[in-house]
Amino acid sequence: MEALKTATFSPMSVLSEKRSEPRKPFSLPNLFPPKSQRPISQESFLKRFNGGLALLTSVLSSATAPAKSLTYEEALQQSMTTSSSFDSDGLIEGISNFVTDNPLVIAGGVAALAVPFVLSQVLNKKPKSWGVESAKNAYTKLGTDDNAQLLDIRATADFRQVGSPNIKGLGKKAVSTVYNGEDKPGFLKKLSLKFKDPENTTLYILDKFDGNSELVAELVALNGFKSAYAIKDGAEGPRGWLNSSLPWIEPKKTLSLDLSSLTDSISGVFGESSDGVSVALGVAAAAGLSVFAFTEIETILQLLGSAALVQLAGKKLLFAEDRKQTLKQVDEFLNTKVAPKELVDELKEIGKALLPQSTSNKALPAPATVTAEAESATATTTTVDKPVPEPETVAATTTTVDKPVPEPEPVPEPVPVPAIEAAVAAQVITEPTETEAKPKPHSRPLSPYASYPDLKPPSSPMPSQP
């Protein structure tokens, strides 16, 4: 009977069942116990989670819709399903369905999370410390930035052939250091000696047009310099320094020496200390001065001569007393030492030009007229002090006429008077003295052959034929 009575009972709600225990206030299960409690296992955690989830769904369903009574079988089935394991496939399917149903919401959430991350990376990223700049921009920044310097890495031969950039108008000077790709530590060591504060120095690097400037810019930027930029197209490129019409120093056509190798070798022997550098500079300066003195010796002598003339004029000719004494000394020197020598030399040159040279030749004697003139000349020279009376000459002529003329004898050759003695006699006897007898003109010829036409003068002997 009791079984039949229970079978005929109407179904009742589980929640409305009366219990003998006092009702406790409603509270959600404690999913996260305090740390002081002992850790629970995974199974108990899943059971509690499922129970809480079922209770939550029932509360929500009762709040949204009027409560419905459940049968005993439904309540039993519901409790059995809640106690089963957690269905992960259903959760994933639910999430995928939510994403497909609400794409804009998902995209907005992703953007909201991604934008702050991207901005933080962009804003906190440091700028690149090396790069490439055009020649005009580099020149402008060299003028505006006090810590910017121009580094020329070309070879020495390029300096001699092409020239070098001129930044003196900006108050700076280009630093030249030849780049050797095989010796990068040595190159960096040279730069450290030339730039004392590399952490605050920005370099603008100029090459020929071979691309080495970009390699050097990256090298120095990674090794202590603040930043470094390669000048685009270098010095000789189509948009380089020269073709951009920037200031340029043309190469000099004088003798130049490359002492960089000598300096490097000496610094390698003595090290990079100050003593080694001073020795290298001293040797280079001595070599340069010696070569300059050897090539410009003529100019140096001219300068010394000009300095001596200026000193002489300042000391000897500036004041009146010194000027008089100097002029007196010059006059004495010219009159006592220079003038006599010049006079004797001039007389010798005049004598050689006017008088014939004395040569011994065996030619025919001069005609009678010439001998007569020579005799008269010798008579005048010998009878300067004692004039010859005229009657004796007349008597001599009369006596020679009366006597018969003997056969002519060979006339001896007259002794020639030296030309120098004749010249001296002509110079000494310039005016006749008072006691000298002036010859009177003869009315008759001196030759006796004019009075005797039958007589003929003797013929001169023929010279011997060779």
UniProtKB/Swiss-Prot annotation:
It comes from the Eukaryota. Residues 1-15, 16-69 form a transit peptide. It comes from Arabidopsis thaliana. This is Rhodanese-like domain-containing protein 4, chloroplastic. The keyword Thylakoid applies. SUPFAM superfamilies: Rhodanese/Cell cycle control phosphatase. One of its GO terms (cellular component) is chloroplast thylakoid. The chain crosses the membrane at residues 103-123, 277-297. Keywords: Chloroplast, Membrane, Plastid, Thylakoid, Transit peptide, Transmembrane, Transmembrane helix. The keyword Membrane applies. It is a multi-pass membrane protein. Rhodanese domain-containing protein required for anchoring ferredoxin--NADP reductase to the thylakoid membranes and sustaining efficient linear electron flow (LEF). Component of high molecular weight thylakoid LFNRs-containing protein complexes containing LIR1, LFNR1, LFNR2, TIC62 and TROL proteins. It is found in: Plastid, Chloroplast envelope; Plastid, Chloroplast thylakoid membrane. Residues 1-35, 373-392, 426-466 are annotated as: Disordered.
